[in-house]
């Protein structure tokens, strides 16, 4: 149970497909992008709609070791919950208590721990995760802290089709020509891709002003580096230079107040500032164009940069939510 989907699949109203960055969560038969995912009531959805998981991160949007509970609503009667056609999924983070508690953890998996898919064996890979959580009092009964850090790394070969004997000589010709004429390193269709990685940081402070009022501060940052393919390497000869880096850096600061103004009136206020960055870049660099070359066999080769995916996206989104 190391992902959001691993918890939700226990509920028959959810259909979970895929793992890692490819996990898709469908609620009540709806599209997997129709969910609204929040962390402590603050939206953590994919702002661009490019991730199959619907999250604002490539892998888990938050470490499950930092969560106290996951709450799911399908048709809530509340003005504070909306923007979804599937399910509203809220992850609630842990808080510090009067007792110091901590945990150091690590786990790994590879292809030997995964079953075959339709009789076909899984390609070789390895996935490692390490992290820690720690919480306790700063001022007993008044001020508490909770921190968590997690890093993950995944190694996997490229998803390339085998190179046919009649095509290898032409592919070598293309590689040599680009190197000798333009001093351009195209790489090779079959290669060990750079590792995919993720780092997550959570810092939470809870201050109990008195029995009726409390304030809260949460800092969360998630950094993803993911290597993605284009032009279907399982059907074409896609050189390593044609893959591209898909990095995400999401930083969030949340300030919250919860209090009872009177016996009949309660107030909850939240202010959140979110900065989202996605600076995509081709492994082949930015100074060489996109080329498709037809081989004598009728197959296609893509030996240069993937220019269509180069972009810099920066989204700053302050939000206020009084209730």
Where are the language model's segments positioned?
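Flexible, solvent-exposed coil segments and beta strand-coil junctions
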Residues: 50, 65-69, 110-116, 177-186, ...
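Outer-membrane beta-barrel domain signature
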Residues: 76-80, 119-121, 190-193, 242-244
């Amino acid at each position: 149970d190391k992902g959001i989907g691993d918890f939700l699949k226990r509920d028959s109203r959810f259909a979970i497909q895929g793992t890692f960055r490819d996990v898709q969560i469908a609620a009540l038969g709806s599209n997997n992008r129709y969910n609204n995912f929040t962390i402590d009531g603050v939206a953590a959805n994919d702002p661009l709609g490019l991730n199959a998981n619907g999250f604002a991160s490539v892998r888990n949007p938050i470490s499950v070791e930092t969560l106290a509970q996951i709450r799911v609503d399908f048709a809530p009667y509340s003005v504070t919950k909306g923007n979804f056609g599937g399910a509203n999924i809220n992850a609630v983070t842990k808080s510090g208590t009067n007792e110091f508690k901590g945990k150091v953890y690590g786990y790994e998996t590879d292809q030997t721990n995964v079953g075959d898919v339709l009789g076909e064996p899984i390609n070789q890979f390895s996935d490692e995760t390490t992290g820690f959580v720690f919480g306790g009092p700063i001022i007993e009964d008044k001020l508490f802290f909770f921190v968590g850090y997690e890093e993950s790394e995944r190694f996997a070969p490229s998803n390339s089709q085998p190179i046919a004997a009649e095509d290898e000589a032409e592919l070598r010709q293309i590689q040599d020509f680009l190197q000798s004429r333009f001093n351009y390193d195209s790489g090779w269709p079959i290669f060990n891709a750079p590792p995919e990685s993720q780092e997550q940081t959570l810092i939470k402070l809870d201050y109990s002003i008195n029995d009726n009022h409390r304030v809260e501060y949460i800092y969360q940052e998630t950094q993803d580096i993911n290597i993605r393919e284009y032009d279907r390497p399982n059907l074409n000869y896609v050189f390593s230079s044609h893959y591209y880096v898909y990095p995400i850096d999401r930083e969030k600061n949340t300030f919250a107040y919860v209090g009872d103004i009177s016996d009949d009136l309660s107030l909850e206020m939240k202010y959140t500032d979110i900065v989202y960055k996605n600076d995509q870049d081709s492994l082949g660099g930015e100074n060489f164009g996109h080329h498709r070359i037809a081989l004598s066999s009728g197959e296609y080769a893509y030996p240069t940069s993937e220019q269509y995916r180069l972009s810099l996206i920066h989204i700053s989104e302050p939000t206020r939510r009084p209730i």
